[in-house]
């Protein structure tokens, strides 16, 4: 045993939240997709602002129920992970000072888009803007078993068609976690967390997902229609 006094410090990497989209939110999203397909909603090509190597990525309308679900999940993340992301981005005195001046810090979904990926399209490792980001899988036209048939030598470790996070381990090495891409499942994660989407090969149909960024904004409390969720969180 050493006689020296020393302290220990462990490194923590952020995690993610996952849920299946509630039926009422799913119906709202389906209505928006239908209106886009029928030309009732105009979209903008947003590929030049994104990292994806995809044939089509377009703006998607921000709707009430989806916005409420996502901002609520951000607050859930803060509760579960002890406000870790906020503490990294904002000094507590800054939040406390402006809260006392009548300002509210709240989450707002500001950027939303839909991804249409064809065979061989992919997203290289990248990060997003904002505090939190999410991906919602709408259509996955293949199964893991179908993709593994193209690469049998991978012996169950085939990554084609998969979604993957990258983060630091406790000893500083880069590790990753593959996340299953189930239709109508949503994953929320810190925007600074690197992630990637691998190409698929077994199907000629489109892989469709929706992604977006949620920001942490300061607004005057007099302009807020809902209670200030941060008045009791002066940590």
Report residues per predicted region.
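Non-heme Fe(II)/2-oxoglutarate
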Residues: 1-102, 112-115, 119-123, 159
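Short hydrophobic/aromatic beta-strand or adjacent loop that forms the aromatic wall/cage
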Residues: 12-16, 133, 207
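Solvent-exposed residues in well-ordered beta-strands and their adjoining turns
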Residues: 22, 117, 137-139, 213-217
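Catalytic core of non-heme Fe(II) oxygenases with the double-stranded beta-helix
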Residues: 110-188, 198, 205-206
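Catalytic core of Fe(II)/2-oxoglutarate
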Residues: 169-235
């Amino acid at each position: 045993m050493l006689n020296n006094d020393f302290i220990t410090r462990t490194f923590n990497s952020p995690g993610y939240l996952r849920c299946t989209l509630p039926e009422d939110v799913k119906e709202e999203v389906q209505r928006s997709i239908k209106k886009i397909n029928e030309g009732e909603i105009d979209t903008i090509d947003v590929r030049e602002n994104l990292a994806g190597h995809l044939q089509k990525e377009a703006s998607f309308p921000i709707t009430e129920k989806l916005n409420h679900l996502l901002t609520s999940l951000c607050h859930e993340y803060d509760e579960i992970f002890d406000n870790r992301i906020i503490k990294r981005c904002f000094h507590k005195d800054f939040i406390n000072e402006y809260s006392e001046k009548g300002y509210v810090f709240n989450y707002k979904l500001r950027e939303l888009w839909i991804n249409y990926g064809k065979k061989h399209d992919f997203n290289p490792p990248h990060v997003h803007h904002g505090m939190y980001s999410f991906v919602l899988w709408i259509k996955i036209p293949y199964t893991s078993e179908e993709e593994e048939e193209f690469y049998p030598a991978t012996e169950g470790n085939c990554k084609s068609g998969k979604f993957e996070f990258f983060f630091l381990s406790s000893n500083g090495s880069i590790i990753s976690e593959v996340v299953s891409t189930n239709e109508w499942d949503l994953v929320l994660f810190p925007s600074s967390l690197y992630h990637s989407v691998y190409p698929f090969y077994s199907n000629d149909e489109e892989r469709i997902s929706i992604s977006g960024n949620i920001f942490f904004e300061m607004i005057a409390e007099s302009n807020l229609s809902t209670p200030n969720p941060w008045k009791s969180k002066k940590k």
